[in-house]
Amino acid sequence: MIEILGLSYFVAQVGNLSDWRRYAEDVLGMPVSSAPQGGLYVKMDERPFRMLIVEGDERRYLASGWELASAAAFGHALQVLEARAVTYVLGSAEEIEQRGVQALAVVIDPSGNRHELCWGHRSDCQPFVSPQGVPRFVTGDMGLGHTVLPAPNFDETLAFARDVLGFRLSDIFNFRPSPDAPAVRIHFLHCANARHHSLAFAEYPVASGCVHAMVEVDSMTEVGRAHDRMLAQGTPLSATLGQHLNDRMTSFYMQTPSGFDLEYGFGGLQLDWTAHSVLEFTRVSIWGHDFSVGRQQ
């Protein structure tokens, strides 16, 4: 079985890199730098980047980068893919250089989401210094945060994530837009770290290629300060401040320049998976998180 350590990075596309530069620095509080082949690195911790932004005609999320522990773990992952008859493509020299890793293998899940398996990230030993004074983001061995991806082919995609990529179920949400409507499934998955979920799948298509990605800060004060910066910069709000029921994250949602949402939160659960029981929860949040504000814009 493949053992993924966490969400190492994501790749997104935008028409003008300066839009992401302003958003990262002025709203998220993350410094940026130039990436090879003309992209933009967005830095969250001691690594050179956690978000790779490239320029293109379409605003969208392009890929999720999943970290493996070693060359041996990467080789084992390729063996698993071959044994399962899963098509993969090894990353080009340009892709490996741009992502700053030792090796890369690309797989596409049954809903069309691109997953990049990688190992051996490059480090420049430069500290994280926020342009907005954010002390730190909660990353480390839990990865950059989480990503929620569209899965219109839900059963096949969930099976792929669990049986091929090695993710395990954290919790289940069956969303009903109205009491008589059929349930829309959203399943939350974890990997080899304590974060409640590093990946989730939602049973519907999303034009931008991602429902949302999440980043976590280490205090509620920093969530509030980011909320103020969002308002000051005129960034579209997607959901009001609230606290989720499943992972207890207190957060708000806003739109990125690539068209998908970003959740900015504090206080997400870190779990001992040997003692965890899967929960089906019946509401998104304990309080707040009014998503109708995003639909009104």
Predicted regions: what is each one?
Residues 4-10, 24, 30, 42, ...:
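Short, structured motif recognition centered on aromatic/hydrophobic residues
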Residues 34-69, 92-94:
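Conserved donor-binding loop and adjoining core beta-sheet/short helix segment
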Residues 47-52, 112-115, 195-199, 260-261:
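Short, charged/polar, Gly/Pro-enriched secondary-structure boundary elements
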Residues 20-25, 81, 112, 157-162, ...:
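Conserved active-site tyrosine of GNAT-family acetyltransferases
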Residues 1-18, 61-66, 122-156, 168-170, ...:
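N-terminal beta-strand motif that seeds the catalytic metal site of vicinal oxygen chelate
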Residues 6-15, 56-152, 184-190, 234-297, ...:
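Vicinal oxygen chelate
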Residues 2-49, 149-196:
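Core segments of cupin and vicinal oxygen chelate
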